């Protein structure tokens, strides 16, 4: 099956003149809750953080100066725009139904046609994930056609930094090969439009030997790279010699000399380690990096090997030995690159070397000798100041600019670094690196808050804590200490907006750190609560009374607990089922609301959160969905609730009512009225009249306008938040494209 993935049709081409009768019929049949006007156009931008997620692969185009691409594990793919010095996102057109395609397993370029780019898209292989697809573009990613595959991909699974699995025949661009995790090798002969499995491919690619043990059990890794040997063929004809690498410690490298019909093991190859990358020099020599595991979670051993097909010889050129201190601090080799202008110039990266740190090694003699680069480097953090606290790690790919030998790129778990002066480094200078990440936003925000005073936005972010965003378009440092690892929940007092709480996790937690923090100045400074509740594992959800005098915290794996002195003493909240979501009324200090997804029941407290009683319900809608409660900012006793396929609900005057027209409610937020004296604007990520999208209503949910468009859907949208001070502005979190904000055009 093939579908087109393109932006919206220009408005001038949507229709010609409509007969008056048909217009009348349409006006009668239009659902009353839909706005009669056209959808409201919005301008969308990322809140500037800079990186924040694992960039898993890089590619320069070999014949087009300034053209490069990057892939990520959960945030889609990007193209570098040399004129603006920014990365351009290519996959924002995917909506919630296709959010699984935001994880890019592999990317491939046609070396003879700079306009063609291919993506293997699919994030997970678990039972609930959808199948993957191959996306192909003839306009550098401005639009894609999609070929659905009959199997799943793992762009955010073990081995995601290996590659590339997807390859274009350099002599005949119609031919592509794709190495899969558990389904062997697949081939296309029509620029990726149709695919078939290659028969006779080595069975080890589908075996248990090509799996690896992760934190949640075994995962298939399979074929991790496919490489055509361009010198074995000629333009216009299929390349006969092809290499394929399998992630196994057994025989792992295979070659075909007849265009992929027959395969045999390459003789003399090393065993006992898994290959992750294979790169060809202009002299026909190949270089392979190895680890005992595919990464990125772990890699404890590894090597770098040189293979010369002309003589059939293999040479171990590993730049640095393993530690011999017996401390279990071994490391692997994550990537290797060859300078396209000089086959003797190599770069290779360590992987998971935490003592003393990961490094990149450089050779100018084909691997006979090496110099560590990062140990003699300076890093410019000005583009994203928060990166100063993060050393390079998970260096799973390296690329050398084919037009500029001074520039190399390497990926990390939080973005892309670029060098300025590699040739000067060879002459004794310190290497200079800058964070080449503008436009590439890959954080996974877990909660957002737009207060009525102070900074326009505060965030809680996975892996990197969170930020006070005083200027949405300028990167900044994370929150001042104490620091969290995952920021997971953030809330403020409705009538004391500068009083803010946040909760999260702390990695390694060596000093029994308290995982709840309070700020009295809108997030500028923070202090820890006095203690945690006697049960739970931190994180969870926090809410604070309208007057700021009582806080309810529901840590992970615990019930709800209330404190009146920021953790000096805790009391267990009564009357709530496990897992209920809680929010404080924004006006009445004694009132709290709780919503339980398992039963669909709403609970209300009128005694300051000490106890709750059931007040209504809509029926069960699934414990897989996290409902939201949004009390109205200036009216006591009124709140909105999201209930998945049960729709959008409003609690008012002691009654729970389902708002008409909203078929599915994923997330919502409240913002400033669009008109002076009007009702708060509701922003909704959900389904209205059969169409998923981002909507707004300034009529208490009676009418809705869609405000996203077909080119800007950002995969999964969550934690929708209106701005209480700026009419029309909305913020939301994504599943890997950072924080997005929009304003009416």
Briefly describe each language-model feature range.
Residues 21-31:
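Bacterial N-terminal signal peptides
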Residues 1-17:
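N-terminal secretory signal peptides that target proteins for export/translocation
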Residues 18, 36-745:
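Extracellular glycan-interacting surfaces
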């Amino acid at each position: 099956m093939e579908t087109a993935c393109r932006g919206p049709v220009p408005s001038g081409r949507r229709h010609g003149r409509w007969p008056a009768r048909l217009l009348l019929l349409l006006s009668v049949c239009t659902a009353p809750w839909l706005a009669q006007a056209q959808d409201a156009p919005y301008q969308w931008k990322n809140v500037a953080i800079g990186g924040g997620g694992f960039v898993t692969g890089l590619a320069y185009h070999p014949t087009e100066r300034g053209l490069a691409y990057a892939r990520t594990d959960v945030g889609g793919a990007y193209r570098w725009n040399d004129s603006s010095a920014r990365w351009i996102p290519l996959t924002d057109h995917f909506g919630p139904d296709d959010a699984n395609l935001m994880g890019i397993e592999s990317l491939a370029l046609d070396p003879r046609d700079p306009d063609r780019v291919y993506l293997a898209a699919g994030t997970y292989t678990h039972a609930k994930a959808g199948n993957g697809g191959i996306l192909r573009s003839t306009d550098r990613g401005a639009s894609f056609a999609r070929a659905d595959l009959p199997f799943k991909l793992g762009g955010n699974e073990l081995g995601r930094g290996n590659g590339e699995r997807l390859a274009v025949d350099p002599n005949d661009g119609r031919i592509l090969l794709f190495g899969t995790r558990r389904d062997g090798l697949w081939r296309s002969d029509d620029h990726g439009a149709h695919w078939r499995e290659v028969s006779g491919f080595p069975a080890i690619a589908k075996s248990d030997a090509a799996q690896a043990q992760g934190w949640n059990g075994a995962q298939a890794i399979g074929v991790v790279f496919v490489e055509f040997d361009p010198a074995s063929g000629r333009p216009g004809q299929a390349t006969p010699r092809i290499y394929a690498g399998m992630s196994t410690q057994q025989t792992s490298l295979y070659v075909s000399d007849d265009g992929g019909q027959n395969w045999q093991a390459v003789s003399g190859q090393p065993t006992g380690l898994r290959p992750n990358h294979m790169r060809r020099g202009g002299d026909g020599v190949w270089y392979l990096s190895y680890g005992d595991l595919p990464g990125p979670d772990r890699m404890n051993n590894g090597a770098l090997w040189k293979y010369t097909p002309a003589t059939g010889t293999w040479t171990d050129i590993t730049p640095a030995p393993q530690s011999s201190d017996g401390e279990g601090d071994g490391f692997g080799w994550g990537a290797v690159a060859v300078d396209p202008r000089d086959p003797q110039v190599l770069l290779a990266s360590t992987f998971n070397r935490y003592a003393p740190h990961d490094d990149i090694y450089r050779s100018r003699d084909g691997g006979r000798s090496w110099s560590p680069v990062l140990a003699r480097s300076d890093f410019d953090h000005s583009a994203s100041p928060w990166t100063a606290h993060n050393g390079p790690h998970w260096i799973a790919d390296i690329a050398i600019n084919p037009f500029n030998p001074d520039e190399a790129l390497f990926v990390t778990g939080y973005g892309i670094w670029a060098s300025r002066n590699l040739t000067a480094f060879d002459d004794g200078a310190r290497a200079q690196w800058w964070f080449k990440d503008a436009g590439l936003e890959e954080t996974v925000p877990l909660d957002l808050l737009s207060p009525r005073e102070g900074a326009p936005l505060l965030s809680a972010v996975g892996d990197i804590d969170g930020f006070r965003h005083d200027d949405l378009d300028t990167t900044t440092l994370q929150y001042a200490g104490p620091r969290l690892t995952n920021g997971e929940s953030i809330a403020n007092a409705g009538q004391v907006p500068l009083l803010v709480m946040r909760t999260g996790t702390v990695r390694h937690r060596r000093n029994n750190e308290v995982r709840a923090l309070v700020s009295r100045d809108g997030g500028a400074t923070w202090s820890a609560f006095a203690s945690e509740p006697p049960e739970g594992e931190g994180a969870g959800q926090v809410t604070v009374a309208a007057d700021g005098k009582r806080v309810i915290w529901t840590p992970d794996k615990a019930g709800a607990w209330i404190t009146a002195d920021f953790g000096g003493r805790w009391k267990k909240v009564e009357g709530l089922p496990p897992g209920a979501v809680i929010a404080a009324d924004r006006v009445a200090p004694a009132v709290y609301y709780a919503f339980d997804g398992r039963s669909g029941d709403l609970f209300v407290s009128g005694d300051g959160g000490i106890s709750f009683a059931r007040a209504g319900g809509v029926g069960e809608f699934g414990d897989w969905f996290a409902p939201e409660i949004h009390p109205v900012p200036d009216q006591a006793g009124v709140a909105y609730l999201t209930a998945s396929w049960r729709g959008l609900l409003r609690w008012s005057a002691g009654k729970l009512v389902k708002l008409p027209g909203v078929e599915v409610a994923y997330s919502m937020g409240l913002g400033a009225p669009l008109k002076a004296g009007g009702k708060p604007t509701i922003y909704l990520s959900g389904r209205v009249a059969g169409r998923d999208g981002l909507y707004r209503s300034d009529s208490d949910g009676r009418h809705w306008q869609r405000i996203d468009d077909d080119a800007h859907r950002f995969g999964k949208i969550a934690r929708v938040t209106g701005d209480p001070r700026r009419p029309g502005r909305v913020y939301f979190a994504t599943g890997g494209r950072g924080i997005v904000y929009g304003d009416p055009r």
